[in-house]
Structure formats: C-alpha cells, structure tokens
Amino acid sequence: MIKRNRFRCVLSTSMLAVGACCVVVPAVLHASSVAGTEIDTELDLLLTRTARDLTGRIKLLEGQVRSSRASASVDLARGVITVRLDRAFLPRDYGPAFEDQRSLIDNALLTVTEPYLHVSQVKYLYGGFDIYHYFPEVKQEDDKAREAGERIRREKQERQRIGIVTGSGVAFVAAGHGYYLDHKDRVWKTQREEHNGIMEGMLTPSYAAELKSALESRSQMPVYRPRVQGGAEAHPESGREWWRMAARYAVAAQYPGHPDIWNTHAGSAAHDREYKEDINSRPLLANHLGAEVAIHMHSNADDTGAARGARVIVQPGRSVDAALGASVLCAMKELIRSAPGYGDFIVASAPHAADKGENRLAAMPSIIVETAFHTHPEDAAALLDPVFRAASMKGVEKGYRLFRDGKDCTPLALSKIDRVTVPANGAAETNVRFDGHPQFPITLSFTPVYCTQPGACRAEEKTVAEASASPIKVQMSCEGSGYGMVNWSTVMRDADGVTSGPVEHWMTCQGGG
C-alpha cells in the first residue's frame, strides 16, 4: 500500500508542431434533381419572395427601373443562387454603388439559405444575360488583373526554382471607405451611413491598425496602409482630419506623379467619380507596390438588420484568393470563438464570391474581410469591443500566415499523449501529440482524474515559450519510492486563449526495490 505524500508527480516540458485540413460540409434541404441541377422548390419560393421584396423597394440607381419579374433559385449541389431580373433593372453605370446594391440583395438571400447550406456565390441575369454582356469592360478589367497575377506567380516560382529571393514581402491592408467629394452638390460625404453608433469608414482604420500590428509582429512582414493613420492634421480641401478621408486623397498626396492610380475617372462628369476612384486606388496602389497580399477591411450591412457574422469576399474564379479566404475564415473562427463572450459568434464556413472592384483590379491574392454586421445591434457591439477587434484581426493574420506558408488551417486539438512508466524518484519523457498551429507560449494543464492514492496527485501547469512542432516531449517525474498509477486529463491552451479539448492518458510510478 502507498503511503500518503510518498507518491507525487512533477511535470516538465519541451516541445515540437503539425497541422492538417478540415472541411465543412453544408447540410441541405430535401432536394430533387431537374436537368442535372439539385433544387428545392420551397427554398426557391422563399428566395424569390425575398428577391422581389428587396428589388421592389431598394433605392434605385440612375437608369434603373423596377423589375416586374424577379425570381431566384438555388442549385444545392453547387451552392449557387441565381437571380433573374428584367433588363430594365440595369443601372446606367457599373460602379461601387451598383456593387453595394447587389451586396444588399446578396445578404438578404444568404440570410434565407444560411440555416440550410453555404452559398458560395449569387449570380445575376438581366434579361437572360449576365452583367458582363452589358458591361464588357468590367470583365476585361478582371481578365487583365487575373492574367497579371498569374504571370507574376509564374515568374516568382521560376525565380524561386533557381534560388533567387522574390517578392516585395509587403502586405497591403486597406481600411474601407472614408470621406469623398460628391460633385453633385460639391459636398464632402461619407460612403456609408451610421448604424448602431457605427460609421463604417471611421471604424475600419482601427481594424486595419490592429491587423497591421499583428502582421508585423507575427508574420514578420512590413505593412502598407493607404489611408492616413491617425493624427489631428486636417485635409486642406475638406477640413476633415486626414485619417477620416478616403484612401484616394492620401494616395494622390503621396503619389502625385501617378494619376493612373488615383485619378482613373479623369474627364468623367459622374458626380461620384471620386468615390469610384477611391475604390480603384486601393488595388492599383497595391499593384504598384508589388504587394504580396491585399486585405481590405470592412464591416457588413443588411437591409433587414437580421444578418450576422463574419464573411470574406473573393473575386469569382480566382482559386488562390478563395484558398486565402478559406484559411482566414478558419483562423478567424478559432480566434474569435476563443475570446471571452464570443464562443458562438457566427463565422462563415467558406468565402463568398462576388465581383468587387477592390479585388477585381488586384494582381495579387486579395480578399475583403467583412468582420461583422454593423446593422445588427449585437454585431455592432462586438465591432466596438477591443477584445473582439484583437481576436478577429489575429485570426486574419493567422489565416494569411498559414496560407503564405502552405499550411492547412486545422483546429487546435490534442490527439494523443503516450502512456509512460516512470522510475521511483526519477523521470521519463512521453510524447504529447497535437494538431493545429498554436501561438506560443502555450500552457499544458494536467488534472488527475484517477490516482491510486487519493491526494497524492495534484493538478499542475507547465508553460512552453519556444515555438516548435508536434510532438511535445513532456518529462514526467515521480517523487517518492511508492508504486502508483495516475490517469491524467490534459488540456493545451495557447497565447491567444485557443484551447484544445481534454485528452486522458496514463502514467505509472514504479515502486522502489
């Protein structure tokens, strides 16, 4: 029999790290197949009602006429919604206001489908044709940037193959929106209205600053932000503080010799031409700088105020950007849900594809991060919370870093801790195996579930500061000469508060001879 206090376990650790991929499979409704397309009639009716309701009351753009025959349906197998509208619903001009209008329709439709499946894209047909049929120049912009990006990647891969260091190593982080000059009334306007105490263009700089800090410290790369960062200095023409101004104006001040970046609508009579130039200036400047990645920070909006959660928008047809978006969402989910109070915060399971100028003109992997909906009261409260801001931006950084390094985003999990036998008054190592990519330092918490001698085994923690890969080498010690067994329940927690589930493992202390 073991005497009390003669059997005590002491733990010390050293460490090493690994990852794998996880796939989220959406649930579907009761589906039937028509001409090779999986459909759900009831869901299509809901989508059609939603599309008709919104297009029947949404603010029309110049040249638009209400669509009398709006309908919508979803291909369950492909996860794509198709919206069919009259040709008369086309605006006179394709620009950011039209993209914003479609985003409101997208978000209303996605709110309908979210409980059942992930929709990757909402496509629109106007009189039976897609938007590029009427605005071929938009498709040409997309094709030009896509081809440039593919050429840059091929050249980079070839230089790497022969041992030449390539790339600028710069990340481009753009805070969306800000003040612009509307030439209709010659008034300086914000690109977004206030909701729940949030003006999007005044919020995004704080998120861009948070992400910049995380990228510089963790991804070890310089970051360029096109909007002015803080300070009380006033923009001369508007009288507003510089940090409140849209990126276009800071870019014009810094690059006066490159109107091809910030004055892309020179000669246009459109009242919102500087708004359009602001959208264009961000990706065009990223191209000019040769940035490795472009991340555009936004908050989201919904007409009904019902939509919630974080989303990432990528350009349709760009698989590299989609891979980056998926990695960012995966890491955002892990980091946000590890933050106090956000354990059930909604994060999209995969990116959404939508044609947006910020991504369309970019020749590098480019994503729009819609961190939360400022039109929903609880999401808005989260957006104003420094805890949420830090967690979400650490998630964006981690997702990018894993993508850059060719690693899959895998949730942190302890997979196995080997059983070990320890000599009396001695120590022995065992392996702690884990999945995922924890942020160091990490803490291992050991709690006894069963102990041969009750009270002889006590819970302990050990912190490991040096980053390494799985498996962790854990030195486990027995004090005293008595024989005993312990069943431990162990949890790993990283520096960001990401915690694994518990795993149980056994240790035997050999008695002295």
Residue ranges and their predicted role:
Residues 402-428, 512-513:
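Short, compositionally biased P/S/T/A/G/V-rich stretches that sit at domain boundaries
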Residues 77, 81-189, 201, 213-218, ...:
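Non-catalytic propeptide/linker segments at domain boundaries
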Residues 151-308, 314, 318:
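Catalytic-core regions of hydrolytic enzymes
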Residues 296-307, 313-314, 344-410:
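Active-site-adjacent mobile loop/cap segments within catalytic or ligand-binding domains
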Residues 496-513:
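Short beta-strand elements
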Residues 264-277, 337-360, 412-417:
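Short catalytic/ligand-gating loop segments at beta-alpha or beta-beta junctions
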Residues 32-78:
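N-proximal, solvent-exposed amphipathic alpha-helical segments enriched in charged/polar residues
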Residues 417-420, 451-469:
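Low-complexity "stalk/linker" and mucin-like segments enriched in Ser/Thr/Pro/Ala/Gly
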